[in-house]
Amino acid sequence: MNVYYEQDADLGFLQGKNIAVLGYGSQGHAHALNLKDSGMNVCVGLRSDSTSCQKARDAGLEVKTIADAVTWADIVMVLLPDQNQKAIYEAEIAPNLVPGNTLAFAHGFNIHYKQIIPQETINVIMIAPKSPGHLVRRTFTQGNGVPCLIAVHQDYTGEAKQQALAWAKGLGGTKAGVIETTIKNETETDLFGEQAVLCGGSAELIKAGFETLVEAGYPEELAYFECMHELKLIVDLYYEGGLSRMNYSVSDTAEYGGMTRGPRLITPAVKAEMKKILEEVQDGRFAREFIDECQNGYPNLNRLREENRTHSIEKVGARLREMMSWLIKK
């Protein structure tokens, strides 16, 4: 696996070019501001009625409609929600691209699953910071950066990889390290991680643990602390130093209990189900299911959101978080 640093990237591959960042959310604001502060000529492309227009202007960025931004730009970074990209690409992006332009993404969903099929006469690249946008921005302003992934899907001009590296450098990523991958590998591992571990597996494990304690007669408050609240303490240890750091930091009782009981939960049957989930990502079944869900108005997602919203762990959690002065109330 190739890893690149400061000396491997040249901002000259972006200098003198017009750069459009479409979207001004978590990633969009970080990409636009970091590249602007790196000396690039940047505009933000948004719907004319977007509430983000004024935020971008207040940050010193030029704002254009999406179509105008694409027409103006040499390099276009698409940082719009996955489910919106296809329609916007067909209506406002594709008609305004010209040969030699570069189309960039921070996630490969629409390219990998062929929701977007770019013309052959442009570069298509991916630059994916491995952190939320606020951290991309904060580390940059501190003179550092976060690790990034890059990939080249199409190289029409012969400069696609150099442009991807330059973009990563403009974000601050080459100070941490930039890993070269493929659109396929980024997309499939990202979706699997979200579904099996980060957003799906962990949430279901939390709820199952909470329900087990409550059904056994323990107070909801104690169940919340043990199965939800304290998870952050453990995840922070994983984040800082891996499994070994966590095991070193907890009590011997916790370490022994975790190592001997954990495998009874995550059995070969669980891993077999993980493999099925991965297969659904790999063969496109999940993508087709999600696209159909979006086109039908999110009936399943809305139902599942309501089930989660009304789960008792949410109600007791809301009460307990009122006791935590260090939390930012939203």
Swiss-Prot record:
Substrate binds at residue 251. One of its GO terms (biological process) is L-valine biosynthetic process. The keyword Metal-binding applies. Residues 1-181 form the KARI N-terminal Rossmann domain. HAMAP family: IlvC. Keywords: Amino-acid biosynthesis, Branched-chain amino acid biosynthesis, Magnesium, Metal-binding, NADP, Oxidoreductase. The active site is at residue 107. InterPro entries: 6-PGluconate_DH-like_C_sf (IPR008927), KARI (IPR013023), KARI_C (IPR000506), KARI_N (IPR013116), KARI_prok (IPR014359), NAD(P)-bd_dom_sf (IPR036291). It comes from the Bacteria. This is Ketol-acid reductoisomerase (NADP(+)). NADP(+) binds at residues 24-27, 47, 50, 52, 82-85, 133. Binds 2 magnesium ions per subunit. Mg(2+) 1 binds at residues 190, 194. It holds the Pfam family KARI_C. Belongs to the ketol-acid reductoisomerase family. It catalyses: (2R)-2,3-dihydroxy-3-methylbutanoate + NADP(+) = (2S)-2-acetolactate + NADPH + H(+); (2R,3R)-2,3-dihydroxy-3-methylpentanoate + NADP(+) = (S)-2-ethyl-2-hydroxy-3-oxobutanoate + NADPH + H(+). Disulfide bonds: none annotated. Its EC number is 1.1.1.86. Mg(2+) 2 binds at residues 190, 226, 230. Pathway: Amino-acid biosynthesis; L-isoleucine biosynthesis; L-isoleucine from 2-oxobutanoate: step 2/4; Amino-acid biosynthesis; L-valine biosynthesis; L-valine from pyruvate: step 2/4. It comes from Chlorobium phaeobacteroides (strain DSM 266 / SMG 266 / 2430).
